[in-house]
A protein has these predicted regions:
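Conserved alpha/beta-domain cores
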Residues: 260-594, 604
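Non-catalytic, soluble scaffold/interaction modules
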Residues: 1-333, 339-346, 356, 376, ...
Length: 604
């Protein structure tokens, strides 16, 4: 094929979940779902055999997952809990027992019964608003798919079998798939579906291979051997790039690597502005295995430790000793830095069957987080005892989510005081001066922040939920997600108000959520007077570098101008223009994905 006959370049844009740039050939991996062709009734004599057929498929699926876990690359063995979760799902009553019961009661084949169980589970997850928790339904779907393949006698191609350097292209990748990645063979991956909090994204970040998800139709656009460029910084994928584009992205790759190396080398330096203002930059984590990455990237503590995992992974609620052991190890690993533990932020609809709760029609606005804990004090006290006991081993702070007003906080604080009293009576050590904070993520809490500040030791502004609730936007709803605007003037005024009243009360105000990890927001938040930022570990070096490149004086001056602007668009344009002046590499043309021969030809 001559140069003139070559297909024209085409650009798709998805969600960048792991940074880096790779240029290579596509390897299309079939991950299409098994179609249930036969749904049939069985007679009484066949019931026992059909149940055994299902049980045998589950056993076979378990063996496959165990084999994958044993072959996992050492770089991602810390994420083996993902596969452990899949093994537990197969034993979960809603998955396993419900399917067996359906076979027995309705006298239908195992495939049909499993499909019915999956539909019920999907319905439960569909009612959940929390993005991270909602995406966990894919784990159940992956497990069901594996069992269905075992029932049908169909095997998938394993990524272990790939022998050449390629870019994986798939509709979606399961945790078992990404756990099979050999970084000596697989340069990166791109998928039609997926999100920032998917297991595939987490694994890609751990392996440091570029990945873009949510491309919608890439499997229709690409064939085996198609030349691709994957930009894990911007979420762009170039199909059939021309020579100019290849050269451009090669140069961008080298420039980014040079920049990242420089920033990473300085990640353990303090986040101090050029005029001497110091701000703490901490990590958001969910698993103990993430502590090493947090420390390696210069985290000065854990600003948000999500504790929901223990409540999601099994059939029973976690016990006090299990929680205590986890929290104690966490604080010891992070010493001498602080660890802020957020208490349970789920509704009963997502807890283990041991919670004995019922499904709600709108859980996001229902009995969740602190509301659920106040309604279920025994569950709450178990977690509080574990947190308090762990506080004897290091610097722990406790934070309550979804507080809407003072009475809720006072009721919560009363339970904490009660647990403290019980521990004192038993002579169990804990930090009697433990700091108690409030997650500011509901508009009503913003309105009464001045009142709350008189009773709390610190605030943490949870921007993800605050933006959703304040703008009435479901950011994972594709029809309105574009309206999710961190730079909306209303959001900026809310944040500024919380910081102002926090300062007046003499308490620390931190901020977590996607805004904390966005370099475009850093100067703005500094100007407001935020004391701490908490974000994903891999983003810490870049944020610290931005802080070291600007002055508080300039940030405050820019803030005054920003607060006069009346639309999110104007705010973003102003910030982008100012950041390109203050921090040249944020606006460098050689790092700008819009440059090159594809300008004007972007396709979605």
């Amino acid at each position: 094929m001559t140069k003139d006959q070559r297909e024209k370049p085409k650009k798709l844009t998805g969600i960048a979940v792991s940074p880096g740039i790779v240029i290579g050939k596509a390897r299309l991996v079939d991950r299409s779902r098994v179609k249930i062709l036969y749904q049939y009734l069985i007679d009484e004599k066949q019931i026992k055999w059909e149940v055994e057929r299902f049980e045998e498929a589950v056993r076979a699926a378990k063996k496959q997952i165990i084999a994958i876990r044993e072959k996992m690359p050492k770089q991602i063995q810390e994420h083996s809990f993902i596969l452990d979760t899949h093994l537990m799902i197969m034993d979960d009553s809603m998955f396993h027992d419900a399917t067996v019961e359906t076979i027995l009661k309705e006298r239908i084949n195992a495939e049909w019964a499993l499909k019915k169980s999956l539909q019920k589970i999907n319905k439960l997850f569909a009612e959940i608003e929390d993005e991270y928790v909602k995406e966990r339904v894919v784990d159940v779907e992956y497990v069901a798919e594996r069992v269905l393949r075992c029932l049908a006698g169909k095997e998938q191609e394993s990524l272990f079998e790939i022998k050449e350097r390629v870019i994986i292209v798939a509709h979606e990748l399961s945790p078992a798939d990404t756990s099979s990645i050999d970084i000596g063979k697989i340069m990166g991956f791109i998928t039609d579906v997926g999100g920032r909090t998917s297991h595939a994204a987490i694994i890609a970040q751990s392996l440091r291979i570029p990945a873009v998800v949510g491309l919608e139709s890439v499997t229709w656009e690409v064939q085996d051997g198609t030349l691709l460029i994957v930009d894990g910084y911007t979420g762009e994928v170039i199909i059939n790039p021309d020579d100019n584009l290849i050269i451009h992205y090669q140069e961008k790759h080298l420039a980014q690597k040079e920049l990242e190396s420089s920033i990473l080398r300085m990640s353990h330096l303090p986040a101090k502005t050029v005029d001497g203002y110091k701000i703490a930059v901490m990590a958001n984590i969910e698993f103990l295995e993430e502590v090493a990455a947090a420390k390696d990237h210069g985290a000065e503590g854990i600003g948000l430790y999500r504790t929901e995992y223990h409540y999601l992974r099994g059939n029973e609620l976690p016990g006090e000793e299990e929680l205590f052991s986890d929290y104690k190890e966490m604080v010891e690993l992070m010493a001498p830095y602080p660890v802020t533990i957020r208490t349970l932020d789920l509704g009963g609809d997502r807890l283990s069957p041991g919670a004995g709760t019922k499904t709600e029609t709108n859980p996001a606005l229902g009995l969740r987080a602190i509301r659920f804990c106040l309604k279920n004090p025994d569950i709450f006290k178990t977690q509080l005892r574990a947190i308090l006991r762990a506080s004897a081993y290091g610097n722990i702070q406790v934070m309550f989510p979804m507080i809407s007003g003072l009475q809720e906080f006072l009721d919560t604080h009363a339970i904490l005081k009660q647990v403290m009293g019980e521990l004192e009576e038993k002579g169990i050590a804990f930090d009697r001066g433990i700091k108690i904070g409030i997650m500011i993520e509901i508009p009503s809490a913003v309105s009464v922040a001045d009142i709350l500040a008189k009773h709390a030791d610190f605030f943490s502004i949870g921007t993800n939920d605050l933006i959703q609730y304040a703008l009435a936007i479901d950011r994972i709803n594709e029809h309105v997600a574009f309206m999710y605007q961190p730079f909306h003037p209303a959001i900026l005024r809310m944040i500024q108000h919380v910081v102002k009243v926090g300062k007046e009360a003499g308490i620390t105000v931190s901020l977590c959520g996607e805004m904390a990890g966005d370099p475009l927001c850093t100067s703005l938040l500094l100007g407001m007077g935020i004391d701490e930022l908490s974000l994903n570990a891999w983003g810490i070096p870049a944020i610290k570098q931005v802080i070291r490149s600007i002055s508080m004086e300039e940030s405050k001056a820019d803030l005054e101008r920003i607060l006069e602007l009346d639309t999110a668009k104007k705010v973003r344009e102003f910030i982008e223009q100012r950041m390109s002046q203050l921090i040249p590499y944020l606006g460098r043309k050689d790092l700008n994905a819009e440059e090159g021969s594809l300008r004007g030809r972007a396709q979605r």
